[in-house]
């Protein structure tokens, strides 16, 4: 597509729907990969607080937060796609999105998107779990005869996850809105390309439709 000029709304909607699946998929994949890794790193850092594991994870988080996401995306593209050749530079053009070829071609963009989620959830989980572990009810659980491991898994983990899990939906929505540049960089034929084209070709009707999304 090279641009959509002002036309009937049904046509605009059909073009939008046709380009929606790649955008949805890369964001679902990035959430499914980024959230568990971030939670795991945060849990390890909290349980090993002030030990070498915690320090290594904190350095990793600081690097991910400090380096601009576009730089990380360029590094992923250069190292894994260009130098090592593990992944194609652009997404496969196949219409069947649920094949290994298409999934493999999406992975560089997925990794670029999920790095921010990993850093955010690791930091958030570490903070929440560390606070819970020092709470009075943990001492009470130990006095009732629970071992340290039992107190952590039955009480600390449960209470910290109650706060963390509601943010997963908002995380998905925020990543969905921030995948525009990533789609363009990795040749993902999704909504991001349409959005940029609507600006380039001054198609205001289409721009308003995409902005609503």
What does each model-found stretch correspond to?
Residues 1, 14, 44, 52-66:
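N-terminal signal-anchor/first transmembrane alpha helix
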Residues 20-53, 69, 98-213:
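Alpha-helical transmembrane segments of integral membrane proteins
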Residues 10-18:
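Membrane-helix entry/capping segments
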Residues 2-9:
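Short, small-residue-biased leader/transition segments that mark boundaries at the very start
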